[in-house]
Amino acid sequence: MVYFVSMMMIGLILGLMGVASNPSPYYAALGLVTAAGVGCGLLVSYGGSFMSLILFLIYLGGMLVVFAYTAALAAEPYPEAWGDWSVLMYVGIYLTGLVIAGKYFLVGKWGDSWAGVEELSSFEVVRGDFGGVALLYSLGGWMLVLSGWVLLVTLFVVLEVTRGLSWGTLRAV
């Protein structure tokens, strides 16, 4: 199980690197799907099955719509691939920053425990995952409403930007 979780963590870093290097919107969308899938798989391996399902649906439902509009706006006949030198430079900068931040911030703090939600010392009647969902809807209800409004405003902004060549924001000058 440790090997499986380690491979999923490496996959999460590679997916986030694909989003951060962003050679083309097509590859950034692929990196986002990879990062969302592997990140939710990590949550499942630590015992958070319901929250991982909700996060996966939010990522794929909300963010990929924005990436679809971005890909439609920035349609390139010859997009940059991950093997180009400029993209490899961004990947190198991202990995260097990740290693430096990991050595500086994470020295001895979280590396000692791989315990999941169900491996805690206390005996609980309700799983930790469902307790978190209850807190999300009770104390975090205002954050859900705020997130819904932000997604709605984002949708209207994207629709306004892509409305038309003569009326929208992206018109030929």
Curated annotation (Swiss-Prot):
<comment type="similarity">
    <text>Belongs to the complex I subunit 6 family.</text>
</comment>
<protein>
    <recommendedName>
        <fullName>NADH-ubiquinone oxidoreductase chain 6</fullName>
        <ecNumber>7.1.1.2</ecNumber>
    </recommendedName>
</protein>
<keyword id="KW-0813">Transport</keyword>
<feature type="transmembrane region" description="Helical">
    <location>
        <begin position="53"/>
        <end position="73"/>
    </location>
</feature>
<feature type="transmembrane region" description="Helical">
    <location>
        <begin position="87"/>
        <end position="107"/>
    </location>
</feature>
<keyword id="KW-0520">NAD</keyword>
<comment type="function">
    <text>Core subunit of the mitochondrial membrane respiratory chain NADH dehydrogenase (Complex I) that is believed to belong to the minimal assembly required for catalysis. Complex I functions in the transfer of electrons from NADH to the respiratory chain. The immediate electron acceptor for the enzyme is believed to be ubiquinone.</text>
</comment>
<keyword id="KW-0679">Respiratory chain</keyword>
<dbReference type="GO" id="GO:0031966">
    <property type="term" value="C:mitochondrial membrane"/>
</dbReference>
<keyword id="KW-0496">Mitochondrion</keyword>
<keyword id="KW-0249">Electron transport</keyword>
<dbReference type="InterPro" id="IPR001457">
    <property type="entry name" value="NADH_UbQ/plastoQ_OxRdtase_su6"/>
</dbReference>
<dbReference type="Pfam" id="PF00499">
    <property type="entry name" value="Oxidored_q3"/>
</dbReference>
<dbReference type="GO" id="GO:0008137">
    <property type="term" value="F:NADH dehydrogenase (ubiquinone) activity"/>
</dbReference>
<keyword id="KW-0812">Transmembrane</keyword>
<feature type="transmembrane region" description="Helical">
    <location>
        <begin position="139"/>
        <end position="159"/>
    </location>
</feature>
<keyword id="KW-0472">Membrane</keyword>
<keyword id="KW-1133">Transmembrane helix</keyword>
<feature type="transmembrane region" description="Helical">
    <location>
        <begin position="1"/>
        <end position="21"/>
    </location>
</feature>
<keyword id="KW-0830">Ubiquinone</keyword>
<dbReference type="InterPro" id="IPR042106">
    <property type="entry name" value="Nuo/plastoQ_OxRdtase_6_NuoJ"/>
</dbReference>
<dbReference type="InterPro" id="IPR050269">
    <property type="entry name" value="ComplexI_Subunit6"/>
</dbReference>
<keyword id="KW-1278">Translocase</keyword>
<feature type="transmembrane region" description="Helical">
    <location>
        <begin position="28"/>
        <end position="48"/>
    </location>
</feature>
